[in-house]
Amino acid sequence: MVKRVRFEAPLIHLIDEAVGRIKEHIRERTILHDLFFRERLEYPTFAWQEALFNAVAHRDYSITGACIEVWMFDDRVQVRSPGLPPPPVTLEQLQLHKSIHFSRNPLIVRVLADLGYLREMGEGIPRMFQEMEHYGLRPPEFSTEGFFFVVTLRNTPVYDDDTLRWLNQFASKEINFRQRRLLAFAYCHGKTFSTTEYERVAEVDRDTAYRDIRALIKSGIVAPLKPKSRSYRIIERL
């Protein structure tokens, strides 16, 4: 551990101070986008702030002598909150991007939502996954250690630099994280894919796969290999 900082303040001031200090330690990275090198933060801002705000909103305040902790490493950020997920919330639900409509501290949640710190109930966790996916990073990890609930964000890329550069050609298109994952898969497999492969890679049912593929066709990103085919090819920009 290089440095340890402790904050004690009313909740709103505590959040603002913690956000400011964390920002100081999140590095910028240089990426290639549309033939230009640009600076980008190593973690999406929404993801780590949502983890912090959720910790403040949902920690178990009956546990005394334990604080919310933010640990920053070279390869990851961890937000550790006293109190295990309260029933009916489970780690499995969180890891499956489920929208959770439950709060241990409803009054605190309402105040933080009114002040703009929290999203609508149930929106934050799915968007954390989307933001990490959009950055080409591994999905958020949820775990428990003793009586702490732990959220881990890693800065390790899911895709290699070549794949990320290729995906950048679709940056102006409205594609979701499932479609982005599928495009990366297709890039590494001859730039073609089938409906069955989409279901497996994106971990969705056939109806969702069909809707996503139709949206990609409508956007001019993919096209059937043959009329009425369930296999598709990527249409690249010139």
Please annotate each region the language model reported:
Residues 1-238:
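C-terminal regulatory or interaction extensions
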